């Protein structure tokens, strides 16, 4: 199943099945800022879990809409952030308006991180965390000029964090990876050999 943004940008209506599974998007919330989705990712994941067969492994896709353009302007001020903490990338003008936009972007990233933490806390509460493979990544770089939709680093550099309880040793790496490897890796981890 999934919540938020499922499989995209293809058109799965023709096939009649979304590769991400059944949608769990019924639970809504009042977002803290206008650029943030009203989808309650955490409660929708809980609905999926309640609906699932507890004797079977599960796969769930949380397709966060954040951070995407449409950030609420000056949301950073409501979060008591300061322009002085911003380091503007060299491909953008070093201007207070740009710094504010970067901080508005960070507000959405922090919101997404908080939602993910709540899902992790739920997995821990249910005793599922140590046996759940969690992959966090994105489909493109930051939504700024000279970044997203380009082949420069800022357009293709995406986060990647993977945890699986004590089954994967914690480490940081700067090695190049390919998202093409995700599906075979997940199938292998699930013991599916085809």
Task: List where the protein language model places each region.
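Short low-complexity, flexible loop/linker segments enriched in glycine and/or proline
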Residues: 15-25
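Active-site-proximal cap/lid insertion segments
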Residues: 8-13, 27-39, 48-194
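Long, well-ordered early-domain segments
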Residues: 1-7
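A short loop-to-beta-strand scaffold at the N-terminal edge of the catalytic core in hydrolase folds
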Residues: 44-45
